């Protein structure tokens, strides 16, 4: 087990996650999440604080079915991780913590700014790191 190699891979996957969440002026499709999240029913558990409520999701399909319609309201969206990505690895499990800032513009022209704090749990499945738990809270 090579902690440096594992940490590098998780950093790369976290950046891929951020890029998918930053479609800028293109439609948000979620394409690429299948290479980041564990797939299959009840493979993931997501708690996202959104619109004054908590969204709980259990599969990548639920994730896409929830966020694609929300993101269709935006003509532009982009996020950046703040300089605080922390990665802890123990065997086949890893935890990342971070915060992101960003925002965009709705299709009716309203500017939106956002910040969230995140915790993600990664598990090595079939020799590949996969996201199995995500918790995002509005900051």
At which residue positions do the language-model features occur?
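Short S/T/G/P-rich N-terminal loop/turn motif that feeds into the first structured element of a domain
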Residues: 3-4, 107, 124-126
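A solvent-exposed, acidic/Ser-Thr-rich amphipathic alpha-helical stretch
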Residues: 4, 11, 30-90
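Short, aromatic-enriched amphipathic alpha-helices that serve as compact interaction elements
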Residues: 6-32
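Hydrophobic/aromatic beta-strand elements that line small-molecule binding cavities or substrate pockets
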Residues: 63, 81-87, 100-102, 117-123, ...
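Short, cysteine-centered beta-strand-loop-beta hairpins and adjacent loop/turn segments enriched
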Residues: 72-73, 103-113
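Residue-level preference for beta-strand/loop junctions
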Residues: 79, 92, 96-98, 113-116
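Short beta-strand edge/turn micro-motifs at domain boundaries
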Residues: 95, 115-139
